[in-house]
Amino acid sequence: MSLAWRTLQKAFYLETSLRILQMRPSLSCASRIYVPKLTLHTKHNMPPCDFSPEKYQSLAYNHVLEIHKQHLSPVNTAYFQKPLLLHQGHMEWLFDSEGNRYLDFFSGIVTVGVGHCHPKVTAVAKKQMDRLWHTSSVFFHSPMHEYAERLSALLPEPLKVIFLVNSGSEANDLAMVMARAYSNHTDIISFRGAYHGCSPYTLGLTNVGIYKMKVPSTIACQSTMCPDVFRGPWGGSHCRDSPVQTVRKCSCAPDGCQAKERYIEQFKDTLNTSVATSIAGFFAEPIQGVNGVVQYPKEFLKEAFALVRERGGVCIADEVQTGFGRLGSHFWGFQTHDTMPDIVTMAKGIGNGFPMAAVVTTPEIASSLAKHLHHFSTFGGSPLACAIGSAVLEVIEEENLQRNSQEVGTYMLLKFAKLRDEFDIVGDVRGKGLMVGIEMVQDKISRQPLPKTEVNQIHEDCKDMGLLVGRGGNFSQTFRIAPPMRVTKLEVDFAFEVFRSALTQHMERRAK
């Protein structure tokens, strides 16, 4: 597309949005979303979509609310004052029960990597459902072995032995057992701000306040300082493996990083004071997801892994959110840190929303587990899950989604970084590939989190304009952006304009 045509197209979108004061949502994908309570300049034309959803003919909205209140656990909370009742999905689009269309920039919590209801994945699932759903792993079936061969080919030596399970929590739970069985030690370390699951075992690894219980959830899990170069005590303008750095000043030499060295000293302090002289392991997300897309200084994980191994521990990379090409430059997040874990856990994007997860390790660690217990999962590695998993890997390769994550992700990061320059309440824009965090602050000097009520309103405004993003951070102060990996630059442009309008609207409210 030529520059002149792009300019003409942008002018057309602007002219269209100014002419349309209010449009009722219809069931056609060509319709524009109705935007209540927002000023005219905040309305933006959605990118085109050639899919029309089915007419919603299920439960009335109020009936859904009543069922949710009476019969679903109160821990099942939803975004927004009026939660969305979603009806259908197509690639990067979601449709609610009223026919409104939304651009999904959170992918079901960083899960729907190849797009909602991708036709190839759907066709494979239907074909396998007609053939064989479930046997349990006490019988052989080709989908499991085909998938194991495909997945192992994407991992470096010696990470070649695969345990198939059903969720990220279950995968990390098993990884904890593996680490303790192999090392014959107990203590496991994880970062503050880490999220590794909500099972009774993994709750000890998870260090985000709202997920912690008032009673002991597990033993021998210790936290260490998260090397957060924006919110932490140290950080500069060259720390991150990202096209966008923090606004903090940096006096480091070109070949050094003072922030990294200081965070390593904190890690050593944890090893020297909070755990036994020999430990079982260390868990790390290559980029923290739930904590708001937090990146560490370059080389930190590499040095931390070496220190852990000196204590007899194994190193576990939690790739539940970062794996399968989402970060763009590499297929796995640990590869971006130039390091090699002993165990890798994965879920979410592995099945594009179908319940599936895996733990991958070395033959030596796998053998040690077999000597300690007979591990078994009734549903892990089912024919249906494995067929879907193979289809997801094929789509990622055939559609060059890792390359798209790199190209469009870099474009998105650089574009959203402009908001940090324009708005004082945007403290940081960070990330890699199609995993981006936008941290909201009261001001850039104090870096104090923007109050949750204000972040909520910005979130609501984005939704009202047809954009769905996630939330993260210990104070829910960070917007998490992780669209399906097939997202286009045109869709990024729309998301940027919506987000910018939501921020402008917020500043107007503040000024009143």
Swiss-Prot record:
Optimum pH is 9.5 for transamination between L-alanine and glyoxylate. Optimum pH is 10.0 for the transamination between dimethylarginines and pyruvate. Optimum pH is 10.5 for the transamination between L-ornithine and pyruvate. Its cofactor is pyridoxal 5'-phosphate. Its EC number is 2.6.1.44, 2.6.1.40, 2.6.1.18. The modification N6-succinyllysine is found at K69, K260, K302, K415, K418. CDD domains: OAT_like (cd00610). The modification N6-(pyridoxal phosphate)lysine is found at K348. PROSITE patterns: AA_TRANSFER_CLASS_3 (PS00600). Keywords: Acetylation, Aminotransferase, Mitochondrion, Pyridoxal phosphate, Transferase, Transit peptide. One of its GO terms (molecular function) is beta-alanine:pyruvate transaminase activity. It catalyses: glyoxylate + L-alanine = glycine + pyruvate; (R)-3-amino-2-methylpropanoate + pyruvate = 2-methyl-3-oxopropanoate + L-alanine; 3-oxopropanoate + L-alanine = beta-alanine + pyruvate; 2-oxobutanoate + L-alanine = (2S)-2-aminobutanoate + pyruvate. GO terms for cellular component: mitochondrial matrix; mitochondrion. Residues 1-39 form a transit peptide. Expressed in the liver, lung and kidney. It holds the Pfam family Aminotran_3. Inhibited by 5-fluorouracil and 6-fluorouracil. Inhibited by phenylhydrazine, hydroxylamine, l-amino-L-proline, para-chloromercuribenzoate and HgCl2. Its main location: mitochondrion. It is an enzyme of class 2 (transferase). GO terms for biological process: glycine biosynthetic process, by transamination of glyoxylate; glyoxylate catabolic process; L-alanine catabolic process, by transamination; N(omega),N(omega)-dimethyl-L-arginine catabolic process; positive regulation of nitric oxide biosynthetic process. Signal peptide: none annotated. It is found in: Mitochondrion. Belongs to the class-III pyridoxal-phosphate-dependent aminotransferase family. Multifunctional aminotransferase with a broad substrate specificity. Catalyzes the conversion of glyoxylate to glycine using alanine as the amino donor. Catalyzes metabolism of not L- but the D-isomer of D-beta-aminoisobutyric acid to generate 2-methyl-3-oxopropanoate and alanine. Catalyzes the transfer of the amino group from beta-alanine to pyruvate to yield L-alanine and 3-oxopropanoate. Can metabolize NG-monomethyl-L-arginine (NMMA), asymmetric NG,NG-dimethyl-L-arginine (ADMA) and symmetric NG,N'G-dimethyl-L-arginine (SDMA). This is Alanine--glyoxylate aminotransferase 2, mitochondrial. It comes from Rattus norvegicus. The lineage of its organism: Eukaryota, Metazoa, Chordata, Craniata, Vertebrata.
